Amino acid sequence: MPSFDIVSKVDMQEVDNAVNQAVKEIGQRYDFKGSKSEVTLEKDAIKILADDDFRLKAIVDILQSKFIKRGISPKALQYGKAETASGGMVRQIITVQQGISKEKGKEVVAVIKDTKLKVQGQIQDDQVRVTGKNRDDLQEAIRTLKGKDLGIELQFVNFRD
């Protein structure tokens, strides 16, 4: 029985490269001269520390442009609230999403059921497995999911006949 898996994974090496490029650009930009702003990557979270809201927004813009250049979807990032830190600084934490949460998995399965195709979706940990009788239905399910905006970046892997 043909099947495929739907996953939401981000290459952490590319995230590291994008953060390093952003740090380099921040160090070279004129509007950040004398600033104590910093960007650090900790496991699956990016911590931004900036002097004020203006610089925080500028750093987030730099990070987004670097992520897009490195082929990482902006949907893979979850932005925390900007909060004040010690010394009058502003802090924001950006989480890199790995895997599909249970709620998003339920949304994906609901979208698949709404297509009225002869395919079934089942949630397995941080991925969704879709099985069906024929390959064309599975490809139609992929097309439908690509057309929907579920708020996360989806990849389709392990297509088996």
Swiss-Prot record:
Top-level division of the source organism's lineage: Bacteria
CDD domains the UniProt entry points to: YajQ_like
Keywords: Nucleotide-binding
InterPro entries in the cross-refs: DUF520, UPF0234-like_C, UPF0234_N, YajQ-like_sf
Family, as annotated: Belongs to the YajQ family.
Function per UniProt: Nucleotide-binding protein.
Classification via PANTHER family: UPF0234 PROTEIN YAJQ
Protein name per Swiss-Prot or TrEMBL: Nucleotide-binding protein Gmet_3206
Species of provenance: Geobacter metallireducens (strain ATCC 53774 / DSM 7210 / GS-15)
